[in-house]
Regions:
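Structured C-terminal subdomain patch of bacterial secreted/periplasmic proteins
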Residues: 169-232
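Hydrophobic alpha-helical
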Residues: 15-23, 118-156, 166, 177-178
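Hydrophobic alpha-helical segments within soluble ligand-binding/sensing domains
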Residues: 49-71, 172-191
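Structural motif
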Residues: 5-6, 110-126
């Protein structure tokens, strides 16, 4: 409650703060709270928002299925919650659609951010034959391990290409900024209402970073068409 105690009128919180957000919201009814990826809206001043991350992971799966040589995709997963499991399923189904021999191997690290654990997980997956590394965690450690090992990888949440320029095929980008601007303006002008938002490629909340030229133009065209289809 340090932020609201300092007079902030609109507070945005990320994963891991669902129950604390609702607890504090009860004590500060005049403050608007926005919680990412949660589902509890116990008070009228609490809204939730999330992105259709599975749409982006569908694109990654298509790319991975085409780029792998070992047919093993390594996936570093944070927590076994619907958001993460949905992404694993979407990626695997998309990969198997273009390459039926695909197998997905998963390491659960039970954290959103821990470079040490993420590095160990990436290396363990590579040691098990994965030549494509994916992550639903937030550090750059996995892509850096992949770069060193000479395998493909995908960035998470932002463009991580500079950390692994040869390894990264692209990155999923979580672009919350238009939503934050829209909701902050609503809070300021008095039109803010409780809601649950779930946007994706169509709205731009999920986006893709530039593609690695190693993919080749034909694969890039396939992915761009698939992205259009998912956004329609």
């Amino acid at each position: 409650d340090g932020f609201v105690s300092r007079g902030l009128g609109d507070v945005y919180k990320r994963q891991g703060y669902m129950d604390p957000t609702n607890k504090v919201a009860k004590d500060f009814p005049n403050v608007k709270f926005e919680h990412a990826t949660g589902y509890k809206r116990e008070h009228s001043n609490v809204s939730t928002y999330s992105a259709r991350f599975y749409e982006g992971r569908t694109l990654l799966g298509h790319m991975a299925g085409k780029m792998t040589k070992t047919n093993v995709i390594g996936y570093i997963a944070s927590f076994p919650i619907p958001e993460v499991i949905r992404g694993i399923n979407a990626m695997t189904l998309a990969a198997q659609k273009v390459n039926p021999d695909i197998k997905t191997k998963i390491v659960w690290v039970f954290t959103w951010y821990d470079p040490g654990k993420e590095s160990e997980a990436a290396q363990a997956l590579i040691d098990q034959g994965a030549d494509v590394i994916m992550q639903h965690t937030d550090s750059t450690a996995p892509v850096q391990v992949a770069e060193k090992a000479g395998v493909w990888s995908f960035g998470q949440a932002s463009d991580m290409q500079r950390f692994a320029p040869k390894s990264i095929l692209t990155s999923i980008i979580d672009d919350w900024s238009p939503y934050y601007v829209e909701r902050s303006i609503a809070a300021r002008d008095g039109t803010w209402k409780q809601q649950d938002t779930w946007h994706g490629l169509k709205e731009g909340m999920v986006a893709m970073a530039p593609y690695n030229s190693a993919m080749g133009s034909d694969l890039v065209k396939e992915v761009e068409q698939l992205q259009k289809d998912l956004a329609s």
